[in-house]
Every structure is written in C-alpha cells, then in structure tokens.
C-alpha cells in the first residue's frame, strides 16, 4: 500500500535539532505564523501583478521551508520563484496556488504534530 509522505520530514528535523521537541515546536509555530502572513502577501502580489514582490516571498518560503525539511513546499516555492523571474503572469498565478496548497498541508501537519506531541 502506498503511503503519502508527510509534508514535513520530522525525523530529519528532529535529528538536525538534536531531538529537542521544544525547539522544533517553537520553530514550526513561528514558521506557521510567517507562512500565513507570506501567503496573504503572495495573493496580493498576484492581484497586483507584482512579480518582484512575489519572487521575494517565494524565495523566503523556499529557504525557510527547506531548512525545516518541508521539501514539497520548498519545491513549490522554487517553481513560483522561477515563474516570477520569467514574469509569466498566468504561470505565476498557477504556481502561487500550488504553493498555497502545499503551505496549507504544511500548516495542517504542524497543527496535527502539535496536538500529537
């Protein structure tokens, strides 16, 4: 049976942080807050057609999510960043939605992890 991978590799994240669940919880909580703000800003940047603002947001999400082992979100943000570099408005809209969908999964995973930990 195929199992869907978690949006966050908690084992790798815990290993990187010496198994300290309090640090992981703190980092993920801050990330979830920033992600909510960044996603709202990214939606506004799409509406405004502001490719540079959207690229900066995608770049920030790409790096932070990679550091926190949320690799599918990081990949989606990387694709959005590339679309912004190409200034392809329709592709930016699509990639922003893909990134938002991945971010929703990450936020749900963080909330579930908080409840279970």
Question: Which functions belong to the PLM regions below?
Answer:
Residues 1-117:
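Two-component system phosphorelay core
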């Amino acid at each position: 049976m195929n199992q869907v991978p978690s949006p966050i590799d908690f084992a790798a994240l815990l290993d990187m942080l010496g198994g300290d669940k309090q640090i992981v919880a703190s980092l993920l909580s801050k990330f979830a807050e920033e992600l909510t703000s960044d996603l709202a800003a990214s939606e506004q940047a799409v509406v405004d057609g502001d490719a540079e603002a959207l690229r900066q947001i995608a770049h920030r999400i790409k790096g932070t999510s990679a550091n926190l082992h949320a690799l599918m979100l990081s990949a989606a943000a990387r694709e959005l960043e590339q679309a912004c570099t190409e200034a392809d408005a329709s592709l930016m809209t699509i990639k922003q939605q893909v990134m938002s969908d991945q971010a929703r999964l990450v936020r749900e995973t963080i909330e579930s992890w908080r409840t279970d930990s």
